[in-house]
């Protein structure tokens, strides 16, 4: 017999993990299904060393550490976390949903989508023949910072993440350079100010025109935008941060038909989608005034969970405070 859950949360990033914790506080039988081999979502998978400063209660915390703390918090209340498992179909039944994954099948009374931007892949350099250098001399994901200690590093990109990486490596690298194809950076004003005050060498407006493996490190040709001028440079390693292409293509294979706006799930003020007992939170939703912050997602989770519990168990006791559960 297929196991029945009150709430199945699809997505184990910060939004899904905190919603799973709160669902456990409401004593809902809850599971989280995450396609990646670790909890924490895109931030933890792609930028584990990145510092996060906009989560309440932390002056600053590494993405990997935030993910670990959220996972630990979620497991405290008995919420099950299923890693490395992908939802391949959701079928509507009379008063529940049948969820099929690549590994198992489950029944659930309600679904909470916390899928973020869906599957994501890095935008790579437009230079052929570099695959053999990936994760050796060219990086599209951030490994442990120790990989870059006492080395000459080039970071390519113009957004907040590229600036964050350059500033994070500044204290440990031999030298840090940041190349961007525009004169102005797209980062937040405070980040750009920190960059200007740092020892990071900024090279603008340049585009990477060629990369060649050297005996030690790599040779990088930079082309100045608007001219034919080329600059020959040499670095030990290159970190490319051109952003990511994302899609929720897997959802197109599901039997249920969810309304989307600009490839995001359309929800109301209670995080409800167009389908009964299916809710959505986090970066993958759209509503008036939506802010794509982890802190915002932390608030959306309890709103959705409380509404689910009101729908499933109208007579059940309402929200509780955490101290009433853990201080006994």
UniProtKB/Swiss-Prot annotation:
Keyword Secreted: no
InterPro entries named among the record's database cross-references: FAD/NAD-bd_sf, FAD/NAD-binding_dom, Fd--NADP_Rdtase_type_2, Ferredoxin-NADP_redctase_2
Alphabetically ordered keywords of this record: FAD, Flavoprotein, NADP, Oxidoreductase
Source organism superkingdom: Bacteria
Transmembrane listed as a keyword: no
Requisite cofactors: FAD
Cofactor: how bound: Binds 1 FAD per subunit.
Matches recorded under Gene3D superfamilies: FAD/NAD(P)-binding domain (3.50.50.60)
Molecular function terms, GO-annotated: ferredoxin-NADP+ reductase activity; flavin adenine dinucleotide binding; NADP binding
Residues spanning the membrane: none
Reaction equation(s) it catalyzes: 2 reduced [2Fe-2S]-[ferredoxin] + NADP(+) + H(+) = 2 oxidized [2Fe-2S]-[ferredoxin] + NADPH
Its EC number(s): 1.18.1.2
Binding site for FAD: 34, 42, 47, 87, 120, 283, 323
Assembly and interaction partners: Homodimer.
Family in the record: Belongs to the ferredoxin--NADP reductase type 2 family.
Protein name: Ferredoxin--NADP reductase
Originating species: Pediococcus pentosaceus (strain ATCC 25745 / CCUG 21536 / LMG 10740 / 183-1w)
């Amino acid at each position: 017999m297929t196991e029945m859950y009150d709430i199945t949360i699809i997505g184990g990033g910060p939004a899904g993990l905190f919603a799973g914790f709160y669902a456990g506080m409401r004593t809902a039988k809850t599971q989280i299904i995450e396609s990646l081999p670790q909890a924490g979502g895109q931030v933890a998978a792609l930028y584990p060393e990145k510092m996060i400063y906009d989560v309440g209660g932390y002056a600053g915390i590494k993405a990997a550490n935030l993910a670990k703390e959220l996972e630990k918090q979620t497991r405290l209340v008995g919420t099950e976390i299923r890693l490395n498992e992908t939802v391949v179909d959701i079928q509507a039944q009379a008063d529940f949903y049948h969820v099929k994954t690549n590994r198992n099948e489950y029944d659930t009374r309600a679904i909470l989508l916390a899928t973020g931007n869906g599957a994501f892949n890095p935008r790579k350099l437009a230079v052929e023949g570099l695959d053999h250098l990936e994760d050796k001399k060219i990086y599209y994901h951030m490994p442990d910072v120790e990989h870059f200690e006492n080395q000459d590093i080039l970071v390519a990109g113009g957004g907040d993440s590229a600036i964050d990486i350059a500033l994070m490596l500044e204290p440990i690298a031999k030298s840090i350079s940041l190349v961007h194809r525009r004169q102005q950076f797209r980062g937040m004003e405070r980040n750009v100010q920190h960059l200007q005050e740092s020892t990071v060498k900024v090279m603008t407006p340049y585009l990477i025109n060629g990369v060649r493996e050297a005996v030690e490190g790599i040779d990088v040709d930079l082309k100045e935008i608007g001219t034919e001028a080329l600059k020959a440079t040499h670095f030990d390693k290159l970190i490319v941060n051109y952003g990511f292409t994302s899609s929720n293509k897997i959802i197109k294979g599901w039997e249920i038909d969810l309304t989307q706006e600009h490839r995001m799930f359309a929800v109301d003020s209670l995080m409800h989608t167009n389908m009964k007992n299916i809710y959505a939170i986090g970066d993958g939703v759209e509503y008036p005034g939506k802010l794509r912050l982890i802190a915002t997602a932390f608030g959306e989770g309890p709103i959705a969970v409380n509404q689910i519990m009101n729908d499933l168990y109208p007579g059940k006791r309402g929200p509780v405070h955490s101290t009433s559960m853990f201080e006994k």
